[in-house]
Amino acid sequence: MDNVKNEKTTDFQKTEEERSKKEVDRLWKEIGWHRPLGGMLYNYLLLLVVMLPGILVVSVVVPNFIMPYPEAVGFYNVTLSYLQVIFFAADFGLKNASERYIAEYAETKPKKAIRYVSFFIWFQMITGLIQITVISAFSIMILPQTDMGYAVWFFLVYIMVQWPGTIGIFQVALNGFQQFDKANILYVIQNFAIQVLTAVGFIFLGRWYGIQNPQIGELMGATMGFIVGMYVDDLIGLLLGMYFLNNTLRPFGLTLKDAFIISYDKKLAKQVLWYGGRVMPSGLSFYAVSFLITLMLTAWLPNYSTLIGLYYIASTLVGALSMTFPMTAPLSESYNNNKKELSLYLIRMQFIWWGILTIGFFLIPVLLMFPLILLRIGGEFAEASWMIFPLFIPAFLLFPSNFAGIICEACDLPEQSTFMNFIEQGTRLLTYFLVLNPDFGILLLVGRENVVYFWLLAEAPGYIAKGFYGWFIVKKKLFPHNKIDIPIWQTFFIPFLAMLPEIPFVIAMVGVFNLVFALNQILGFIILGIFLISMLYLMPAYVLMPMFGFLGGWDEK
């Protein structure tokens, strides 16, 4: 009798669990802010497990023990600038187009959505082989005759990322199906766990090879290892993306195999290429201008490889200020189904949470804690600490400037997003030219030793020009009869006031770290890890968010 009773209890519990799971799935599929927010919060929890150790390795271990050469990072970024313009032109805007259409059909017609994935995969694999062939021939026959002759092997190794070249589609597909938790897991694991491990391992291998072969040298060997590590990281990320997408497709009666089967037709290919062709000039202008700026830097900026390497470290730390939510899919789903008020709600919530993250969570660590810590433990990269402050201004302007373009792309106005980027890139190119040109402009007024400060601020004018035009278009073209009503007070002022109590705590933390680090470096690093956890988790939970609510951050007006 007891056995029968226990079996009934177990069956009842299983039934309740199944009902609960179905209810959770039903609520999750409802349109709203909970999906972007849930994805972000899920991602934020991963910081402690994966990203925090990655930050410590990149900011402490790498510059002190693994790759104490800012020049190696500079050479890598120069190579990237030369090749990315070609990569993006060959991609033909398919990433943007795929995310737009996958998001539209993911819930209503998943089999149609997977056809866009299939087209992206086959297009990328075929064009990737063409790119590898052409650029390899260029690198072997022409590049040695130029000032970039030292970078021949950098080009030959890095071009391999274009085959199979499909890693991006799995991130796009997960976002399109609004599986932001899986997309965030993929992003964090690849960019902070796998990337660190592969980069460290291959940098050591490259340095060893350079020492064994003096004609190459340790610096060039480290650079080569760094680039190889990036490629291996992409291959591992590709396998992870395939695994996550396969799990996402199962509830729809689909598998990863369906993504590799040629299921698209001429009409779909034409639709995607037409949309991508309208979006592509926007992104292409960025990479083309970045390429021209790289030419200016290598020609006019003394010691460019070191400065570019330091710039990369500083901009990576400042990049936390631009943390946003994946908004293309929810905005596309709401606006293209004639739910404008929902679209406006999503826009307002994005602003509020951007303010919470940028000003509340990251402003104090980025501007106060990171520079002081980097100065102490950064080794050859310590000089990047002074770059953080001028880079803060363009980093803070980036989101308001870019968000208008994201809205236009999601709401089927890609040509306006393209024009916004033309405005930004035109202003950007002119600004860098006026800053770096040795014959006239700012350099003559401030001197060569001070022009670096203006170089660090050179992105800001383009963001400002793009932002003014972008929000004018969003209002005029998309919401002419609706009030956008950006929550200025809740976005900027309340997060700033809410984080002020953290300042004395951070100053005290830095003082304790310096004292302990001087006595015992290992114990100092442990203290640093505890401080980072406090700033990223404890202070927001027990100081920032209660203060945000107390000051009226969640009030409707």
Describe the role of every protein-language-model region.
Residues 18, 22-33, 209-229, 238-286, ...:
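Interhelical loop/hinge segments that connect adjacent transmembrane helices in multipass membrane
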Residues 1-24, 251-258, 507-557:
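Membrane-proximal transmembrane or re-entrant/amphipathic helices at the cytosolic face
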Residues 2-96, 132, 136, 158-161, ...:
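Signature of the first transmembrane helix
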Residues 35-36, 58-85, 151-152, 216-227, ...:
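Interfacial/gating helices of multi-pass transporter permease domains
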Residues 140-157, 366-398, 445-450, 480-481, ...:
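Interfacial segments at transmembrane-helix termini and the short loops linking adjacent helices
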Residues 39-62, 225-249, 262-329, 333, ...:
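Transmembrane helical elements of multi-pass membrane transporters/channels
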Residues 104-120, 310-419:
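Specific pore-lining/lateral-gate transmembrane helices of multi-pass inner-membrane transport
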Residues 178-182, 192-243, 415, 425-468, ...:
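Membrane-interface helix-loop junctions in multi-pass transport and translocation proteins
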